[in-house]
Amino acid sequence: MFKVLAVDHIGIAVKDLEEGKNFWSDVIGIPCTAQETVAEQKVTTTFHPTPNKSEIELLIGTAEDSPITKYIEKKGEGIQHIALRVDNIENAIADLMAKGVKMIDEKPRIGAGGAKIAFLHPKSTKGVLLEICEHEDR
């Protein structure tokens, strides 16, 4: 059995990372505290933590075949995924699969900030791309 600890972050696909970063930092007042390129996922991300430790994650593709680049081409900018922080990602994946949830990732992989991540297929989540994640330091 696993436990959901919090909404970890909301991932927003953007065409211009600097514009997005400036909006969330200067207009909304949630400063960017980290920027990272995750080569394996062909994405650059920025993180804007809120006082309750949930974050806004901005994502931009770094290649034409990046899932984020393809997402923006198909659907435009906007919310791309919601991530839930879990206490044990391996248990979460096993429990979800046992309940018939279709997983994009049947094993955790490493995402931004070194988090262990896995995605649930939108066909199992009523159309929402849902990420589960586990952080060593949270």
Predicted regions mapped to residue ranges:
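N-terminal beta-strand motif that seeds the catalytic metal site of vicinal oxygen chelate
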Residues: 1-19, 77-86, 134-138
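Vicinal oxygen chelate
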Residues: 2-3, 46-49, 56, 84, ...
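Short, structured motif recognition centered on aromatic/hydrophobic residues
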Residues: 7-14, 24, 48, 53-59, ...
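Amphipathic alpha-helical segments
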Residues: 18-31, 97-99
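Short glycine/proline-centered loop/turn elements that form peptide/ligand docking sites
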Residues: 19, 37-41
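Short secondary-structure junctions
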Residues: 29-37, 101-107
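A short, acidic/glycine-rich surface segment
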Residues: 43, 65-70
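Mid-chain, well-packed structural core segment of small domains
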Residues: 71-99
